[in-house]
Structure formats: structure tokens, C-alpha cells
Amino acid sequence: MLLHRNRSYFKIAIIADRQRQMTFFKLEHAKAFYYADFVAYILMIVLVSGLLIGYAPRGEWRHIVLSVAGGLALWPLIEYALHRYVLHRLEPFRGWHMEHHNRPRAFICTPTIFSAGLIFTLVFLPALASGNLWIGTGLTLGVTIGYLAFSWTHHAVHYWRADRAWLGNRKRLHNIHHGSGSACNYGVTTSFWDDVFGTRSG
């Protein structure tokens, strides 16, 4: 009897811990807070661009432009890998992401401080290993622009009318992703990596 009670206690403790985690990483927000995420990233991009324009040496401009382009080119692979291998396989991220699948029109998004922290930690800090602050900043700027493009595209496929051919196609493929058991169409902004890895459907 005592053992049974202890097991029940541990089950309750685990459930309570998971609820605390979900509260800390609150994914569903008020409408204003949801849109504030877009504003925050636009401001970050404008600020970093202004700093590069104002302070980067002229001799670094070619490298900066190439690094921004490299960050933009890198983003679709990051998007695909995060969506497929983290959001659909790795707990607790999978559980959080399934909330979006269950309620696709709810105002669910990754907290800005969390996503910005990931970009800083996983992109900017490793990029500094190049030994060039300007290249590292440019690469991070490119990835951040890519993330903002992803956020807008993902928002559009769920909330906007798909009058344009490109958006209509993205919306159609993303709807297949939501309704197929989620094992296809991981790319939101592009299907390039779905084509490469054979996960495109439709």
C-alpha cells in the first residue's frame, strides 16, 4: 500500500513538473504578444544592419555580403532539420509542437527570448570561431532574416488567403504536412530539402 502511494506521488510529481515546464515555455500567447515577435525580429534585423553599415570597415563589405547570403542559404537546411528532427522527434519540443498541430490557428509561437537565444548560441557564437566579427555577424544576420521569412510564411499559410500561386503552393504542402501524420513536407519556406531527402508529398 505504501509502495502504491509512493508511485502515485511520483506520477503526480512528474505531471506537475511537466506542467511547470509548459508554463515556463508558454507557447500560446495573446494576439498582441504573438505579433510582437515579428516586430522584435524586424527591429533586431534593422539594428544589426545599421551597426554593420555604420561600423564595418570598407574592406570587409564583400565578406559581409557573402556571409549574409550564406546565412540566408543556410536557413532552409536549419529550418528543415529543426522541424523534422527536433520538433517531431525530440521531447519536450515534440510535445510543444504537437500543440500547434492540434490547434493550428491558435496563436502559438516560440518565445522570442528563446528563439533569439538559440540563434545567438548556435549561430553567432560558433561563427565567431572564424575569428572575424563581421563575418560572424553577417552570417547571423542572414540566418535571422531567414527565420523571419519562415515565421511570416508559416503565419501566412495558416491565416492568409492564398491568392498568389507561390503562397497557395506553400499552404497546400503545409496542409498535407498537418494532415498526413506529419511525416512529410517539413520545409515551410521551400521544399528544396524535402526534395533532397525524399520527404516531399503532393
Model-derived features: positions:
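Low-complexity, intrinsically disordered Gly/Pro/Thr-rich segments
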Residues: 174-179
